[in-house]
Regions:
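Helix-loop-helix "hairpin" substructures at the membrane interface of multi-pass membrane proteins
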Residues: 103-183
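Transmembrane helix-bundle core of multi-pass membrane transporters
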Residues: 55-128, 236-241, 269
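Transmembrane alpha-helical segments in multi-pass inner-membrane proteins
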Residues: 20-22, 168, 178-246
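Membrane-water interface segments at the C-terminal ends of transmembrane alpha-helices
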Residues: 4-8, 42-71, 256
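Alpha-helical transmembrane segments within multi-pass membrane transporters and channels
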Residues: 10-54, 221
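Cytosolic-side transmembrane-helix boundaries in multi-pass membrane proteins
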Residues: 141-155, 226-269
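Hydrophobic core segments of alpha-helical transmembrane domains in multi-pass membrane transport
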Residues: 53-60, 113-124, 164-172, 198-202, ...
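Membrane-interface helix caps of multi-pass small-molecule transporters
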Residues: 31, 35-40, 62-65, 125-126, ...
Length: 269
C-alpha cells in the first residue's frame, strides 16, 4: 500500500496494485515464516506471537528510511520518515465499500464489501473440500498418522502457512481501504487480538478453524463489544472504553484457552 500511494495510484488501480504486490511479498515472508514454524514445532503459538512482535520494530525502521517521495505520506518537518497514519481517501479509500452500495433510509449496506467477503469465504470452503484441504485438516488433527500415510507433512505445512500469509496480506488491504486510513509503525501491534478473539468465540480451536467459526465469531464478538462499551461508558467514565475493549478481548481469549485445555484433558482420560 505504501508503494501504491507513493505512486499515486487511485481507485481500483491502487487497490489491486496493493493487493497483488502485498501478496507477492507475503509469498516470500510466508515461506520464511513456515521454515521457522517447521523448525520449532509444538511451539507455534508462542513463536507466532513473538515473531509478529519482533517484526514490527523491523518495519518501523523501514518506515523511517523508506524511499518515498509523496509529501502527503512524509512528516512535514524534515521530509524524512512516513507518518504514523496515511489518509487513503484521495487514493483508494473505501473503493470496495462504495461498490454497489444499498441505501435503506439512513442505513448504508456495503454490498461490494460483503460480496467480496462471502465470496472469499466460499472459495476457502471449496478449497477445504479438495484433497489438499483435507490433508491440511488431517495434519492439524493427527500429524503422526498423516506422516505414516506417506505424506510430506512439512511440505503441506509450508503451503498452508504461505496461503494464510498471502490471504492475510490481501485482508489487510481490504481492511485499510474500508477504514480509510493506513496505520503504520505500532498500529498493527494489537490488530491480531480482536481477530483471534472473534474466531475463538466462534468455536475455533488450535486443531480446527472453519469459515463458519469466523462468521459466527465475528458476529458474536462485535455484538458483545457494541453492547458492553455503551454500558461501560454509562456506568464508568468515558475514558474507560478502550480499557474495557482490551479486557473483553483478552478475557475471551483466556476463556477459550482454559476450556480448550479442559477438553484436551477430558479426551486424554
Amino acid at each position: 500500500m505504501i508503494f501504491s500511494v507513493n505512486a499515486r495510484y487511485t481507485s481500483w488501480a491502487g487497490f489491486f496494485y496493493s493487493v497483488f504486490l502485498g501478496m507477492a511479498v507475503a509469498l516470500l515472508l510466508g515461506y520464511l515464516y513456515a521454515k521457522i514454524l517447521n523448525h520449532l514445532k509444538l511451539n507455534e503459538e508462542i513463536v507466532g506471537t513473538f515473531a509478529g512482535y519482533s517484526f514490527i520494530p523491523v518495519m518501523n525502521l523501514f518506515y523511517t528510511f523508506a524511499p518515498v517521495t509523496n509529501r502527503q505520506m512524509l512528516y512535514p518537518i524534515g521530509g524524512q520518515g512516513l507518518r504514523p497514519k496515511v489518509n487513503l481517501e484521495p487514493y483508494f479509500g473505501q473503493v470496495l465499500d462504495r461498490l454497489w452500495q444499498v441505501r435503506i433510509g439512513e442505513l448504508v449496506i456495503p454490498a461490494g464489501l460483503l460480496l467480496f467477503f462471502f465470496g472469499t469465504g466460499f472459495l476457502l470452503w471449496l478449497f477445504s473440500k479438495t484433497r489438499a484441504g483435507m490433508i491440511f485438516s488431517a495434519i492439524a488433527e493427527n500429524e503422526r498418522f498423516v506422516r505414516l500415510a506417506g505424506i510430506n507433512v512439512n511440505g503441506y505445512r509450508t503451503a498452508a502457512i504461505i496461503m494464510s500469509t498471502v490471504i492475510a496480506a490481501a485482508g489487510v488491504v481490504v481492511y485499510s481501504q474500508s477504514y480509510g486510513i493506513l496505520h503504520l509503525y505500532d498500529g498493527p501491534f494489537m490488530m491480531s487480538f480482536p481477530a483471534v478473539s472473534a474466531i475463538v468465540i466462534g468455536g475455533a480451536s488450535p486443531r480446527k478453524a472453519t469459515v463458519a467459526n469466523a462468521l459466527i465469531g465475528t458476529f458474536l464478538y462485535q455484538t458483545t463489544y457494541l453492547l458492553s462499551i455503551p454500558v461501560a461508558n454509562a456506568l464508568l467514565i468515558p475514558e474507560m472504553a478502550e480499557i474495557m475493549r482490551t479486557i473483553i478481548t483478552s478475557g475471551i481469549i483466556l476463556y477459550a484457552f482454559i476450556f480448550e485445555r479442559k477438553d484436551m484433558r477430558n479426551e486424554a482420560h
